């Protein structure tokens, strides 16, 4: 199937990624670990832009940028240099931002995503290094704020800005690109996406192959999808009414789900770029071979290996490699002798499904425990041991607990305030599989109490059988094996 794109939608993204796994800022020795710090405590004369200070380049930031470029299959520049981007804004104490202009460190890369009609390649125009500005805290909403506070803790944190080609044709494709891109960055261990402000996106969008509009500074993948859905609808409505779409910059109000005009093309600033005189150009071709050797197995390669090595489905492999910590957790479970296909089902379908239902995000894996935190409330967090998942899967595989009981154990482990093993939870909740005579008794009672459903099933209504199985599971408090109960009911009613 070929995706027709009837509305002529073109989407390109500019993604600002904090290299927040680095310990120090881009041009000074201040810590990048500022998220729980008091405002303006992770600063120094350099990142505050005080007169007489000179920047000192963080070599590890350059190495991280090269890693990102290699992972994106991009061209790494033989020589690169920094420029000054001149503009006045309160979050930029120097009056200019140190960035890269016409000599980016990476160009001509690509990311392959699942598009509307199969695999789809999104081109990477460039990726360049720069420093993050400070953070403005608006008192109240951004439109009605009567005052602004400035926190310079973020000022100078290393950034990579990645610019894509306008190759995405729907908001869904844009979100899939961001999910894939974030996954690659986390595999490289240069980026923690769970931290506030770690990834900020500017989205450029046009319809009917027309005028481009930029939506600035969107902070989440879901927000990007929502902003694009609204903006595409707005532009189509303008054209439908006989108007023309203006080339402008807009802001996305996430609370209201709308985009609002910030400035038109005529108001756009000239940044007067010129070469940063305090930093020499860099020749980095000699760094590339050694950095290439440090690249980890990336998501697509790991996914292919999981399918071949463990014999699991492509769908399970995609889910399990969507987070490197989840992939490592799964491999730890398999390494302890668990059937990889059963482990994939319980990890990708049940465990990950329960995390998503609770709005929990995987945050860590130390080789023993996988940790997770609430997406909106970092104070809500917990962890599960790989050894506990192994124990649970083995109990299920040995037929000692039903699938429903196993799900109940996972839910309890996710919600529990104190750590307990699966066996302890099963014992406390009475979840060990019911004895055969108990199941037989429950089936007999169910048949006797539900004559209408019995007659419906005998008459050919298949869903009535599901109802009867549910009643048996209810009577046995989920300890019966649903498949066995189903077979016994059929045998009883149809011989």
UniProtKB/Swiss-Prot annotation:
Q: Which GO terms describe its biological process?
A: glutaminyl-tRNAGln biosynthesis via transamidation; translation
Catalysed reactions listed for this entry: L-glutamyl-tRNA(Gln) + L-glutamine + ATP + H2O = L-glutaminyl-tRNA(Gln) + L-glutamate + ADP + phosphate + H(+); L-aspartyl-tRNA(Asn) + L-glutamine + ATP + H2O = L-asparaginyl-tRNA(Asn) + L-glutamate + ADP + phosphate + 2 H(+)
What are the record keywords, sorted? ATP-binding, Ligase, Nucleotide-binding, Protein biosynthesis
Enzyme Commission designation: 6.3.5.-
Primary enzyme class: ligase
**One MF term in GO for this entry?**
glutaminyl-tRNA synthase (glutamine-hydrolyzing) activity
Recorded hits in NCBIfam families, A to Z, give:
gatB (TIGR00133), PRK05477.1-2 (NF004012), PRK05477.1-4 (NF004014)
Q: What does this protein do?
A: Allows the formation of correctly charged Asn-tRNA(Asn) or Gln-tRNA(Gln) through the transamidation of misacylated Asp-tRNA(Asn) or Glu-tRNA(Gln) in organisms which lack either or both of asparaginyl-tRNA or glutaminyl-tRNA synthetases. The reaction takes place in the presence of glutamine and ATP through an activated phospho-Asp-tRNA(Asn) or phospho-Glu-tRNA(Gln).
Record's subunit section: Heterotrimer of A, B and C subunits.
Family stated for the protein in its record? Belongs to the GatB/GatE family. GatB subfamily.
Q: Per its record, how is this protein called by name?
A: Aspartyl/glutamyl-tRNA(Asn/Gln) amidotransferase subunit B
What organism is this sequence from?
Answer: Methanosarcina barkeri (strain Fusaro / DSM 804)
């Amino acid at each position: 199937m070929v995706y027709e794109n009837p509305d002529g939608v073109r989407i390109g993204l500019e993604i600002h990624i904090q290299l927040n796994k680095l310990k120090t800022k881009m041009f000074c020795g201040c810590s990048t670990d500022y998220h729980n710090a008091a405002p303006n405590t992770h600063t120094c004369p350099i990142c505050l832009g005080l007169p007489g200070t000179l920047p000192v380049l963080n070599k590890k930031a350059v190495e991280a940028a090269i890693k990102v470029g290699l992972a994106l299959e991009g061209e790494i520049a033989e020589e690169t240099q920094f420029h000054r981007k001149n503009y006045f804004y309160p979050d930029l104490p120097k009056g200019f931002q140190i960035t890269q202009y016409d000599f980016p460190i990476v160009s001509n890369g690509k990311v392959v995503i699942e598009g509307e009609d199969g695999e789809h390649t999104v081109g990477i125009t460039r990726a360049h290094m720069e420093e993050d500005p400070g953070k403005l805290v608006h008192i109240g909403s951004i439109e009605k704020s009567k005052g602004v506070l400035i926190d310079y803790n973020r000022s100078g944190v290393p950034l990579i800005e990645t610019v894509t080609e306008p190759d995405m044709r729907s908001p869904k494709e844009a979100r899939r690109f961001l999910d894939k891109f974030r996954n690659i960055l986390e595999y490289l261990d240069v980026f923690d996406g769970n931290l506030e402000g770690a990834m900020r996106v500017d989205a450029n969008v046009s319809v009917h192959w027309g005028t481009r509009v930029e939506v600035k500074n969107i902070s989440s993948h879901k927000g990007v999808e929502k902003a694009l859905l609204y903006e595409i609808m707005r532009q189509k409505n303008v054209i439908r009414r006989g108007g023309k779409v203006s080339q402008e910059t807009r802001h996305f109000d996430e609370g209201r789900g709308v985009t609002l005009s910030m400035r038109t093309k005529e108001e756009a600033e000239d940044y007067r770029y010129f070469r940063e005189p305090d930093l020499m150009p860099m020749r980095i071709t000699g760094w590339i071979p050694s950095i290439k050797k440090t690249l980890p197995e990336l998501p697509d390669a790991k996914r292919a290996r999981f399918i071949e090595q463990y014999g699991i489905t492509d769908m399970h492999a995609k889910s399990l490699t969507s987070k490197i910590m989840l992939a490592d957790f799964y491999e730890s479970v398999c390494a302890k002798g668990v059937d990889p296909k059963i482990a994939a089902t319980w990890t990708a379908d049940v465990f990950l499904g329960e995390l998503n239902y609770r709005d929990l995000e995987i945050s860590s894996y130390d080789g023993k425990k996988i940790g997770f935190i609430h997406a909106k409330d970092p104070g809500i967090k917990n962890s599960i041991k790989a050894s506990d998942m192994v124990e649970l899967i083995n109990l299920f595989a040995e037929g000692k607990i039903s699938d429903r009981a196993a799900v109940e154990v996972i839910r309890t482990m996710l919600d529990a305030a104190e750590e307990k093993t699966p066996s302890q939870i099963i014992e406390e909740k009475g979840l060990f599989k019911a004895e055969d005579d108990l199941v037989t008794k429950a089936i007999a009672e169910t048949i006797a109490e539900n004559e209408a459903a019995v007659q419906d099933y005998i008459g050919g209504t298949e869903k009535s059988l599901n109802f009867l199985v549910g009643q048996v599971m209810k009577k046995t408090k989920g300890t019966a094996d649903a498949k066995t109960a189903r077979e016994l009911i059929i045998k009883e009613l149809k011989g």
